[in-house]
Amino acid sequence: MSHHASGPNFGFPHGDARLDMTDLYAFTKPGDSAMSIIALNVHPSFRLDSSEPTTKEPFAPGALYEFKIDTDGDAVADLSYSVQFAWWGDGKQTATVRRIQGETAAGVGEAGEVIVEEAPVSFGREALVTKVGDFGFFFGWRSDPFFFDVNGNFNHMQFTGDDFFKDKNICSIVIELPNSELAANSLGIWCRVLVKDRERWIQVERGGRDRKSTRLNSSH
């Protein structure tokens, strides 16, 4: 699922790049068919409307990043993983992940079972992976795997073959989990980002399907 440049005028939710979703991935772990990987990419390192880079801080500590998983085909979440970040000494960040199952998975909040806390966030090339039981976690900067000829698209589909994203970065939230967590037949996955407003969580970003309208709709 690609969700780049989804805000008004190709901007970011609340003007904060750390809240901006770029891609959602879900796939079987290579070499281990009993495990799956879900990944949410946020915080592009670039702006489409400016040559200025975005902030070096990977994630917004005041935000809630959620994976919603529907396991019975009714488009309502039956399982949720919520991720929050906090500052830790020396300018570092850590992550806490909560697992929520059942009726409350469709809601919003900071409830649920904590399955990992104070997991390190990668600021550089080194991939800091945290393992807890059957779960694996990664949080931090990576090269943006998406590819697209942005300049060709904006030039009336006169494509150049150049990948605009080849030197761009994003911040990844990656969870490796056993297939027993997921449905055997019907499975739906989407993500969203929320921030607090007067003690209430407010959704500022959501995605689960490719965002094709900005590429194919001539009115954009």
Model-identified regions with their sequence ranges:
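Surface-exposed extracytoplasmic segments
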Residues: 1-215
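Positively charged, low-complexity/disordered segments
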Residues: 216-220
